[in-house]
Amino acid sequence: MPTILVSALEASSNIHLEELRHNLPKDYRFIGVFESKEALYSPREFSIMGFRDVIGRLGFLLKAHKEMVQLAKQADMVLLMDSSSFNIPLAKKIKKQDPHKKIMYYILPQVWAWKKWRAKSLEKYCDFLGAILPFEVGYYQKKAQYVGHPLLDEIKYYKKDIKGETLVFMPGSRKSEIAKMFPLFVKAAQILEQNEGFKRRVLVVPSFFKGLDLKALYGEDIKLFEISYDAHKSLFEAEFAFICSGTATLEAALIGTPFALAYRAKTMDFLIARMLVNLHYIGLANIFYNALNNETPGLGESQLHPELIQHFLSVEGLLKAYEEMDRERYFKESLRLREYLKHGSARKIAEEMAFLLNLT
């Protein structure tokens, strides 16, 4: 029975992990940080964003780091997913503790956008790097392989045409995101009803919010929406979606649903990020679309969908994006994007894990 230490701090990473586990033998035992009652910590305890938030939780993060390094002694291998600020130092400490411990990094940090030096650190401390973007491999010397994209394993619904019956609203998975995005989405929904007539309004809620008091999280205006915990099905049925920046924007693009990306950070966090990251786009679909068109990812001229960021984000901007988007062009180009990513990644990652464990 192989024991795997997992560090999956993000909601999206846990969705990818669940799909991966379907491709692994049932006797694999998982320990660490992931969505499970048996885990050391729940990913919800790491649900922070912004530089000030990190400083405020530093004591907890250091404690969790120390416990994960100790827990690694029980593991046959280590699987790190995304969350590079936590996981790269973790890989370094585990490798120092046991140089023979096999470490896989799946869902690589965006070294093509900033902190390119992280690529060298990953190759130094990890044994296999699973790239989910075709262009990522070029930033590494030898240990990275393109394994496919996990969303192509997970998405079961793909549009065959641009039609849809609902408007979908996805204000994020963090409380701070919801507090900023949801009031804007509510106002946009109300004005759209005045202008366009009534359309079903669907609020997609993260699955790990099940059982929580949604009114306390979203406020009284949640009563204006139908609630869905199934993002893929809801996007498939939608005419248009308003989405907080994140993995959901790429999900919408692959499904074929027209959408506008919305994002607003704390002013200080945004200014710091702007100094560190030089990108025209923050949406994954736009970044991939640049690469597809042989442009520098995130810095190209081509755009698949509108992005409303920081002071450009307003109710008026959301309405304009809805009204002016060329839906037919978008749908055609979204099919090209799906072809670019080729296939899913879970089976390849499962094979590489077996290889690292000397089970093949």
Curated annotation (Swiss-Prot):
Superkingdom in the source lineage: Bacteria
An example Gene Ontology molecular-function term: phospholipid binding
GO cellular component, one term: membrane
Keyword Glycoprotein included in the entry's annotation: no
Enzyme class, broadest EC rank: transferase
NCBIfam families: lpxB
Family: Belongs to the LpxB family.
Protein name: Lipid-A-disaccharide synthase
Organism from which the protein derives: Helicobacter pylori (strain J99 / ATCC 700824)
